[in-house]
Regions:
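Active-site-adjacent structural elements that line small-molecule/cofactor binding pockets in enzymes
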Residues: 1-215
Length: 215
C-alpha cells in the first residue's frame, strides 16, 4: 500500500503477518430463523453463520432448509458457495462428568439467564427458568446447549449435523457460565474428546486396536 494521509505516508507498505486462513478473511452473514441471512449468503457467495442453531426452536428448524436457500440464491446470482463455510453456533460447557459440569456452571449461568430474560429480552430468545438446576435442565432438555460430559456434546453435534445435512464449523458461543479454569478445561475436553470423533483423526488407531482385540 502506498498512501499519504494527514499523519502518515506509506511507501509500498505491507503486513508482516500472514492471514490465519487461505483465501483472505472469511466473511459470513448471520442468520437465526428467517431466510434473509441465507439469501444474502447465497447472493454474495460468502459463509453463513447460524447464531440461532440451538438457542431457539425456529433456528434449529431452519437448519433443515437454510442451505438450500443459500444454494438457490447462489445459482441465481452466479456465485459459488460451500457447506464448509457454514458455521453453527451454540453454547457448551463440558467436564469429565455431568455432575462436575453442573457444579461448574453455578459460577455464572444465572446472570446469563437474567440477561436474556431482563436485559436483552429478544422475543425469539425467551428463556424461562428461576433456579439454577432448572436452568441447567432447560438448556439440556431443550437442546439449547450442552452442560455435561463429552458424550452429551457429541450427541448435540450429531443432532445438528443430522438436522442440517452437514456443515463446516461448530462455533462455541461465549457464555461465562463457569470460571476461567473450568472453561479452559471444557475447551480442552472439546478438542480432545468431541472434535476428533467427527474429524476421524483417531479412527485408524482405534480400528487397529479393535482388530487386535479380536484376534
Amino acid at each position: 500500500v502506498t498512501a499519504k494521509t494527514a499523519t502518515h505516508e506509506l511507501f509500498d507498505a505491507r503486513l508482516q503477518l500472514a492471514p490465519y486462513s487461505d483465501g483472505g478473511i472469511p466473511l459470513a452473514v448471520a442468520a437465526v430463523a428467517s431466510p434473509t441471512g441465507a439469501r444474502l449468503a447465497g447472493k454474495h457467495g460468502i459463509g453463513l453463520l447460524s447464531i440461532g442453531a440451538t438457542l431457539v426452536v425456529e433456528g434449529f428448524d431452519a437448519l433443515a432448509y437454510h442451505w438450500g436457500i443459500v444454494e438457490e440464491r447462489a445459482a441465481a446470482f452466479g456465485t459459488q458457495v460451500d457447506r464448509n463455510n457454514w458455521t453453527l453456533v451454540g453454547p457448551m460447557h463440558i467436564a469429565e462428568t455431568e455432575e462436575q459440569a453442573r457444579a461448574d456452571v453455578r459460577f455464572g449461568i444465572e446472570p446469563w439467564f437474567r440477561y436474556f430474560q431482563k436485559v436483552a429480552a429478544f422475543p425469539q430468545m425467551t428463556i424461562p427458568g428461576e433456579q439454577v438446576d432448572e436452568m441447567i435442565n432447560i438448556i439440556n432438555d431443550a437442546g439449547a446447549g450442552v452442560i455435561g460430559s463429552p458424550e452429551r456434546a457429541r450427541i448435540q453435534v450429531q443432532r445438528l449435523w443430522d438436522q442440517s445435512g452437514g456443515f463446516g464449523c461448530m462455533l462455541q458461543m461465549g457464555h461465562e457460565w463457569a470460571n476461567p479454569l473450568a472453561t479452559k478445561r471444557s475447551a480442552e475436553l472439546l478438542a480432545a474428546e468431541v472434535i476428533p470423533h467427527f474429524q476421524g483423526q483417531a479412527e485408524p488407531t482405534l480400528a487397529v486396536a479393535r482388530r487386535a482385540s479380536e484376534v
